[in-house]
Design a protein with these regions (language model features):
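Terminal and linker regions of secretory-pathway proteins
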Residues: 1-387
Length: 387
């Protein structure tokens, strides 16, 4: 998906109002805290001009590093400044590989003035769908089905399916601090009997405007200004840039149909690409080499589940140990109110944001703003619990 969605609906200096569809100043713009560059990548995404050609995550990372080298050469005032990489959703796959590539080619990047300090992943796909979606799906369903108007009868049938598959109480059994070993995958688990998908169908039956991005959303559910509908993971051409074509030359964009999320994959479909999950490959090393890594997750996201992220972290080994040794239990405070829980160990911080969607900065801009301050070192960890 295009980073322009982030600019205009989440953390940019102006933000579209989803009711009036007018752009309004964003008091929680990340540009208040640091210099920001939003990048449409890989090639084939948004307004990017390059042709899709990547066949591995390493090639995605190499392409991005090449962009950075050109950018720093073109704008020499960037050279020597501290750099962080941030992104949400599928960027959870890209960012660890990009950071890993930069660290592995440190001499070239240091010479060019590129100094990476850390990464920030928001509701990211850094693990496989079994851990991120399927294993915690029954627990999520039990926590939210009443608020989503799903019937007791439907839930009973879903619970029976979860029992048969072996995930009915998976989180309760296996999410431990410290972990007791690698996570087991139930033998009965298969895509044709997906509890995750079955609950999604029940939610859509109960609420035509059900959004996997924000499970408590209600009607109406029109397209937003970026051509996105909360009920769908697809993007549509009815958006700001296509309906206001005079904007394109102002931002030096080509005169082409803009989609906030590409309908065609921006890289060649290869099985290898979809099995390169950072948690099993590069993420542990990136955490160890970075000054700070933050993983955020909105508790009301059903694209990826909050306890899927927790399970993934507890199944990952970095800096000499598997998972967190202590359970996340520190309160994140924003303006004197509880905004979530957080925990830090061995240069990794996990933050679970209350009542937040897949796009935390869109629905909960204040916590997102404070967490950026923490990433940048403008506040310390002990300040997260201060109003």
């Amino acid at each position: 998906c295009s980073s322009l969605t982030g600019v205009l609906t989440e953390e940019g200096p102006v933000k579209f109002n989803n009711v009036t569809h007018k752009a309004e100043p964003n008091p929680y713009s990340w540009t208040n805290l640091t210099n920001m560059i939003w990048v449409d990548q890989p090639a084939g995404t948004g307004f990017s001009r390059g042709q899709p050609k990547n066949q591995s995550m390493e090639q995605v990372a190499e392409e991005f590093n090449g962009f950075l080298l050109s950018l720093y050469q073109t704008f020499p005032k960037l050279q020597g400044k501290r750099l962080w990489l941030a992104g949400e959703s599928y960027a959870g796959k890209f960012i660890p590989y990009m950071a890993d590539w930069i660290y592995k080619h440190e001499a070239e990047n240091q010479k060019a003035g590129i100094h990476l300090h850390g990464i920030n992943m928001i509701d990211g796909f850094f693990m496989d769908d079994i851990i991120g979606k399927e294993l915690p799906s029954m627990q999520f369903a039990q926590q939210h089905y009443r608020s989503m108007n799903i019937s007791e009868a439907d839930m009973s049938a879903l619970e029976a399916k979860a029992q048969e598959i072996g995930i009915a109480d998976y989180v309760e059994k296996y999410l431990h601090y410290p972990p007791k070993g690698p996570l087991p995958v139930p033998r009965g688990l298969n895509k044709s009997e997906s509890v995750y998908s079955a609950f999604k169908k029940l939610a859509k039956k109960a609420n035509p405007c059900f959004s996997p991005f924000y499970v408590i959303g209600r009607a109406p559910c029109p397209l937003n200004s970026m051509g996105q509908n909360v009920t769908s993971e697809k993007a549509f051409p009815h958006n700001y840039f296509n309906e206001m074509p005079s904007i394109k030359p102002i931002i030096h964009a080509d005169n082409k149909t803009y989609l906030s999320c590409s309908r065609a994959k921006p890289f060649k479909i290869m099985k290898k690409l979809h099995t390169q999950f950072p948690i099993h490959t590069v993420l542990p090393g990136v955490i160890e080499k970075s000054n700070r890594t933050i993983i955020q997750h909105g508790k009301l996201d059903y694209i990826m589940l909050v306890n899927g992220t927790s399970l993934a972290i507890q199944n990952m080994t970095w800096a000499g140990a598997q998972g967190f040794q202590s359970k996340p239990n520190k309160t994140l405070l924003v303006d004197g109110e509880t905004a979530g829980l957080y925990h830090s160990e061995r240069k990794l911080s996990l933050v679970q944001v209350d009542r937040a969607s897949h796009m935390i900065a869109a629905y909960k801009p204040k916590p997102a703003y404070k967490l950026l301050q923490f990433l940048l070192g403008q506040i310390e960890e002990e300040d997260l619990i201060k109003a």
